Amino acid sequence: MMGARWFRTVAMVLLVSLVHLTQAGAGSVTDDGRIRGRADAPITLIEYSDFTCGYCVKFFKETWPRLQAKYIDTGKVRFVYRDYPRADQGVGVEAAVAARCAGAQGRYWPMHDRLFSEGGRLDSGAFKGYAKVIGLDQTAFAKCFGERQYLESIFQDRQEANRWGFHGTPGFILIRTVGGPTEKEPAIAIPGAFPFEEFVEEIDRMLATAPRSQGAPTEPHGSTAVAQNSQFIIH
């Protein structure tokens, strides 16, 4: 077992406000399509990340494809991307805005994947080029990006990460999202781009005790289960 030297368990000790995630949220102001996987997957993996972060790129290129094939594409885990720009302005923020603006047109993931795979080409010219390649309405994208829409939501993601105890990127949260008293079960915080095998151990442990899915949730769409206005014990 990897033990506490690898991961930290986040125990919520005050009343937690839970907002449920469903794939119906794709394209909404809240999520803009930042969800991969089945809405009724028993486990959710949330990533807090920065498009300019070298370790985030490492995770995307080395670990993510294997996680996607083993868990997301098979319906065992749903994946949520959250923005964590490390600076208050600059390329990281602009890249997050570009991805959100693509999401407004239902093309969040194609933009996300290009931002992580294009070898550091992150500037306004590159963003416009990617927008054209993935088939966005150029005028709408330029307006959205020029007005820096979604800034408030982007920094809300960062605040959410801070409440989980993250102060760097990438950071991951594993939480049960189907069946059972999820608000009473500790989440698992993974503070860094750990190897694929470490994710596998924690995910498989949670899946071993996961209840059988009863179909997609019917609650209003929004963000995944997160702690709001609460406190944590970090072990």
Regions found by a protein language model. Give the residues of each.
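N-terminal secretory signal peptides that target proteins for export/translocation
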Residues: 1-6
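Bacterial N-terminal signal peptides
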Residues: 9-20
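Boundary at the C-terminal end of the N-terminal hydrophobic targeting segment
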Residues: 22-26
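A short beta-strand-turn-helix
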Residues: 27-43, 71
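Short clusters of hydrophobic/aromatic residues that line enzyme substrate/ligand-binding pockets
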Residues: 35-36, 122, 190
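Structural alpha/beta surface segment adjacent to cysteine/selenocysteine redox centers
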Residues: 41, 49-132, 137, 206-210
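Soluble periplasmic/extracytoplasmic beta-strand elements of cell-envelope proteins
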Residues: 44-47, 78-81, 171-173, 189
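C-terminal cap of thioredoxin/glutaredoxin-like
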Residues: 62, 129-235
